[in-house]
Amino acid sequence: MDSNTVSSFQDILMRMSKMQLGSSSEDLNGMITQFESLKLYRDSLGEAVMRMGDLHSLQIRNGKWREQLSQKFEEIRWLIEEVRHRLKITENSFEQITFMQALQLLLEVEQEIRTFSFQLI
């Protein structure tokens, strides 16, 4: 995994955790949780690609990995839409920058997961 991506995830998660969005803080906490889950999934998928010999054990151990992959893409799409929505409604420049960076990171991670999954298929 690219060290810039790791620091980007950590930076965005730290920034999001500092935001105070009033009644929508539960939604923000949900986004943070999904971001963390997405990072872990992307990392594990990347590790499986690095150990291409592990492909068969991945498929045997988890016969539903394609279903999980589909679910992760749905989560990414939801997060992208949620971040875009937040970006449209916020007037705070700190939040705008954070959400713009989060959106860029989500698009990069989506592409990485697609690349990893094609290598595993």
Swiss-Prot record:
<dbReference type="GO" id="GO:0039675">
    <property type="term" value="P:exit of virus from host cell nucleus through nuclear pore"/>
</dbReference>
<dbReference type="Pfam" id="PF00601">
    <property type="entry name" value="Flu_NS2"/>
</dbReference>
<keyword id="KW-1048">Host nucleus</keyword>
<feature type="short sequence motif" description="Nuclear export signal">
    <location>
        <begin position="85"/>
        <end position="94"/>
    </location>
</feature>
<comment type="similarity">
    <text>Belongs to the influenza viruses NEP family.</text>
</comment>
<comment type="subunit">
    <text>Interacts with protein M1. May interact with host nucleoporin RAB/HRB and exportin XPO1/CRM1.</text>
</comment>
<dbReference type="GO" id="GO:0042025">
    <property type="term" value="C:host cell nucleus"/>
</dbReference>
<comment type="function">
    <text>Mediates the nuclear export of encapsidated genomic RNAs (ribonucleoproteins, RNPs). Acts as an adapter between viral RNPs complexes and the nuclear export machinery of the cell. Possesses no intrinsic RNA-binding activity, but includes a C-terminal M1-binding domain. This domain is believed to allow recognition of RNPs bound to the protein M1.</text>
</comment>
<keyword id="KW-0946">Virion</keyword>
<dbReference type="InterPro" id="IPR000968">
    <property type="entry name" value="Flu_NS2"/>
</dbReference>
<keyword id="KW-0813">Transport</keyword>
<dbReference type="GO" id="GO:0044423">
    <property type="term" value="C:virion component"/>
</dbReference>
<feature type="short sequence motif" description="Nuclear export signal">
    <location>
        <begin position="12"/>
        <end position="21"/>
    </location>
</feature>
<keyword id="KW-0945">Host-virus interaction</keyword>
<protein>
    <recommendedName>
        <fullName>Nuclear export protein</fullName>
    </recommendedName>
</protein>
